[in-house]
């Protein structure tokens, strides 16, 4: 039984899907005017884990994440680079797939784009105007916020609270300062589309409402995104969607915490703005992913090199223990009286599932993985090992790897295959027996250059990848 924290109700709730065995999930994606930063990577990774865990529990997940390919930032970038908005969007959509692919994020079921849904957006806005929820003014179209009675229910703010500080900017023609834009009148030189309201382009909030509606229907199970989107973006999505669809927009709302850089908010002005495109050249993407899930998704996370190094060390510990298990699989036998270890492995798996069922607590799930590694390290020191126990270890390691999306072997592990390493170790042993120490040292140095470290153990020479 999976429980998750619902921002809408401010409490944990048992997940009950609209359709048995199926999860309809919408995650707000990036505005594709630049490479994504690590703040964008966090929701991509966190909600990928959520999806993976639902699938592990037998659900069919329809996972939709959009691309905002029409926006003020894109238009500004287009003018700076003297390139068309579609050209820039295509470049950074491709870059997004490359970056999150390196972080082992699975491809979405669908990645809708605003430009592909322009006719749908225009019709959606027209429907809202016809229903009295929106109005045209000065070439723009605005949503009548006060007409939607539930406005503020996600961010838990009242209309009176929101009215304080609300204002009408120059050039706006709103009836009320709280109203927000659905359609923007075209400006000279900007990309625009024909509509019943005149030339223009959609506002940001309406885009997600329409794409979610056309991809997943009037009501979805889970809508997710960063905490910064809770208000006004997600609040406005609810207002538009529920006014139009006459049905709840999403049953569960999930929001992930912020990322700080050395305990400071990430911003261009502070010079601590980190692009995934750049950082994965310096930090192993598997380590970056492991670091991101080492903290519960709703908690803020602090990024610095010391903490990333700690994550690298922790992942290495897990991988080294798995390598030991794989090595012992070669000499394991069918021996009895191993139920104690089977029971201990099952207990760790049960704990992993328990903490993941509790609002996808990846931090505690990783603790369970460490405990599995500790037990594995203990088991391989036994004089004899059981095929049944070794297979059980391998199966549970694979479950943890699949759910958390962290591979059991480094992407560089195939530079020199394990069997090739074993052959070189045998050759080195023979060289040492024959007192050919020059050759033995040559092999050791060659392995070291491949980041392979040799260790003498009671069972003979073994290796690990550094």
From Swiss-Prot:
Pfam families: CysS_C, DALR_2, tRNA-synt_1e. It catalyses: tRNA(Cys) + L-cysteine + ATP = L-cysteinyl-tRNA(Cys) + AMP + diphosphate. GO terms for biological process: cysteinyl-tRNA aminoacylation. InterPro entries: Cys-tRNA-ligase, Cys-tRNA-synt_Ia_DALR, Cys-tRNA/MSH_ligase, CysS_C, Rossmann-like_a/b/a_fold, tRNA-synt_1_cat_dom, tRNAsynth_Ia_anticodon-bd. Its cofactor is Zn(2+). ATP binds at residue 268. NCBIfam families: cysS. This is Cysteine--tRNA ligase. It comes from Staphylococcus aureus (strain JH9).
